[in-house]
Curated annotation (Swiss-Prot):
Transmembrane segments: none annotated. NCBIfam families: cysJ, PRK06214.1, PRK10953.1. This is Sulfite reductase [NADPH] flavoprotein alpha-component. The gene is cysJ. Alpha(8)-beta(8). The alpha component is a flavoprotein, the beta component is a hemoprotein. It comes from Cronobacter sakazakii (strain ATCC BAA-894) (Enterobacter sakazakii). Component of the sulfite reductase complex that catalyzes the 6-electron reduction of sulfite to sulfide. This is one of several activities required for the biosynthesis of L-cysteine from sulfate. The flavoprotein component catalyzes the electron flow from NADPH -> FAD -> FMN to the hemoprotein component.
């Protein structure tokens, strides 16, 4: 593709620079050129002292595209749609839900939302404030808005794509016009997303005038993060080396927690505290063999996966999820096999969810035996997806390494030991110096304060302590003078104090100002981190009044909700507020990025 250059007098480039630019981009597609525009815009605005232009009010033809992402999938879909729209010469403003000024929603004419769901039907962390606002009485009428929603979820959870459903339903209730029916996509979302993106482009091309995308539409919020500019992605991971696999719980602990160190070599892979490490794993060969034998299948039977033909056993080991059952798998297996044991569950969503949650796929087959063809088995299963682990290190200290904290999942089903797919792969089946495929999942919604003087409160029981190890390494390297406070909990002090020596050193050296520990099984009555929060409520409120940033990491379904309830009680009690005002205060902290959560 070539473009006619303007007269040299009008250019800020020398003739030699212009020639190099034209040579470098002569074969770029319109989509690639649009992406490059956003890339350069991002570079300009990350230069020291660079001023970001104040964006003028969006004209009626600008499409607002909101990305509400938890693990990065929704963001990738939104970025791909942005590129499609720019290639179609449509103006689009891509913005993360956490950066969106939601009170301007009444002025939107064209609104596209790509939303994932976390936990039990909750919106992603960056979209909590927007979700709460839209579902509240404060939400305005949207009679002049047209919208479309793409939802991402996981059918292994009961409230599949609930956040997307909430946005779609509420926007319609507020009077907005639905451009397209909502799409709810499972973990294998790519094909559905591609088809939906094309439909969105077609509808919008017919609706708005075509014009060259203006610079204002490619805003800093939609620009490329330079840290993220890497050839290694979820689809094209880095082959790294596992260098350390160390059990960090005691001999008598009920938990098996591993400290894992991975050598990134000279790949140049960069991350920040708060990011996650994606790990591609293989299923246990013994589990694969057990499943094959139960179904009377041969491991060497050739099957087709995508464009590849490979043995069935290899396909099961590398390409399909075997350790997480879902209601859909149970229902489809029951229908396919006409199993007398499972057919009574069909049509009862609650019973299907309960059965799937407590019965792994291999045990479902054992309890309801059948004989399947290889293609029938693969048709039941979901594609294998990588697991994400909160990074427990800072490159300011460990350089070309990345550390994670892995709680190994182990349980018994009628005397048979079962284990989590990725956690047992890392703990049991990878020897030191073995290769492991990894990538960085950046998380801009879990970041240290920009100013090193800001106090930090960290709440992370169990393996939720991982990112706070990274935070402290970074704060130490930066010489940050802000106070640091850690709340940590686990069953037993003697067996389960993860990274104990490191925390004690930070306390001794004064970097860790306070540490409050909750050992749930070391006394007759159970004590959890939320109890410590209530106990230290007055001091916690003082820190918040001083501008402290508050972070929570760990279990989404119970711990994070219990911690949030304790925080609300503290805010109400020591801030002199009623429950509604305390909730509003915490929401404001979230909007200001002073209350951030990494929950799963």
């Amino acid at each position: 593709m070539t473009t006619q250059a303007p007269p040299n007098a009008l250019l800020p480039l020398s003739p030699e620079q212009l020639a190099r630019l034209q040579t470098a981009t002569h074969d770029f597609t319109p989509t690639q050129l649009a992406w490059l525009s956003g890339y350069f815009w991002g570079m300009v605005n990350q230069q020291p002292g660079a001023a970001v232009m104040q964006k003028p009010a969006a004209p009626a033809s600008v499409i607002t595209l909101i990305s509400a992402s938890q693990t990065g999938n929704a963001r990738r879909v939104a970025e791909a749609l942005r590129d499609d729209l720019l290639a179609a010469q449509l103006n689009v403003n891509l913005v993360n839900a956490g950066d969106y000024k939601f009170k301007q929603i009444a002025q939107e004419k064209l609104l596209i939302v790509v939303a994932s769901t976390q936990g039990e039907g909750d919106p992603p962390e960056e979209a909590v404030a927007l979700h709460k606002f839209l579902l509240s009485k404060k939400a305005p009428k949207l009679d002049g808005t047209a919208f479309a929603v793409f939802g991402l979820g996981d059918t292994s959870y009961e409230h599949f794509c609930q956040a997307g459903k909430d946005f779609d339903t509420r926007l319609a209730e507020l009077g907005a016009e639905r451009l397209l029916d909502r799409v709810d996509a499972d973990v294998e979302y790519q094909a559905a997303a591609q088809a939906w993106r094309q439909r969105v482009v077609d509808v919008l091309k017919a609706r708005v005038p075509k014009e060259a995308p203006s610079q204002a539409a490619i805003t800093a919020s939609g620009a490329v993060n330079l840290v993220d500019s890497t050839p290694y992605t979820k689809e094209s991971p880095l082959t790294a080396t596992l260098s350390v696999n160390q059990k960090i719980t005691g001999r008598h602990s009920e938990k098996d927690v591993r400290h894992i160190e991975i050598d990134l070599g000279d790949a140049g892979l960069r991350y920040q505290p708060g990011d996650a490490l994606g790990v591609w794993y293989q299923n246990d060969p013994a589990l694969v063999q057990e499943l094959l034998e139960l179904l009377w299948l041969k491991g060497d039977e050739p099957v087709t996966v995508g464009e590849k033909t490979l043995p069935l056993s290899e396909a099961l080991q590398w390409h399909f999820e075997l350790t997480v059952n879902t209601a859909a798998i149970v229902e489809n297996y029951a229908t396919l096999t006409r199993s007398e044991a499972l057919l009574p569950l069909v049509g009862d969503k609650a019973k299907l969810q309960d059965y799937a949650a407590r019965t792994p796929i291999v045990d479902m087959v054992r309890f309801a035996p059948a004989q399947l063809e290889a293609d029938q088995l693969l048709g039941l299963l979901r594609p294998l997806t990588p697991r994400l682990y909160s990074i427990a290190s800072s490159q300011a200290e460990v350089e070309n390494e990345v550390h994670i904290t892995v709680g190994v999942v182990r349980f018994d089903i009628e005397g048979r030991v079962r284990a989590g797919g990725a956690s047992s792969y890392l703990a049991d089946r990878l020897e030191e110096d073995s290769e492991v495929r990894v990538f960085i999942e950046h998380n801009d919604n879990f970041r240290l304060p920009a100013t090193p003087e800001t106090p930090v409160i960290m709440i992370g029981p169990g393996t939720g302590i991982a990112p706070f190890r990274a935070f402290m390494q970074q704060r130490e390297a930066d010489g940050a003078t802000g106070k640091n406070w850690l709340f940590f909990g686990n069953p037993h002090f003697t067996e389960d104090f993860l990274y104990q020596v490191e925390w004690q050193r930070y306390v001794k050296e004064g970097l860790l100002t306070r540490i409050d520990l909750a050992w749930s099984r070391d006394q007759d009555h159970k004590i959890y981190v939320q109890d410590k929060i209530r106990e230290q409520g007055a001091e916690l409120w003082r820190w918040l009044q001083e501008g402290a940033h508050l972070y929570v990491c760990g279990d989404a379904n119970r711990m994070a909700k219990d911690v949030e309830q304790a925080l609300l009680e503290v805010i109400a009690a020591y801030g002199g507020m009623d429950a509604e005002a305390a909730d509003e205060y915490l929401s404001e902290l979230r909007v200001e990025r002073r209350y951030q959560r990494d929950v799963y």
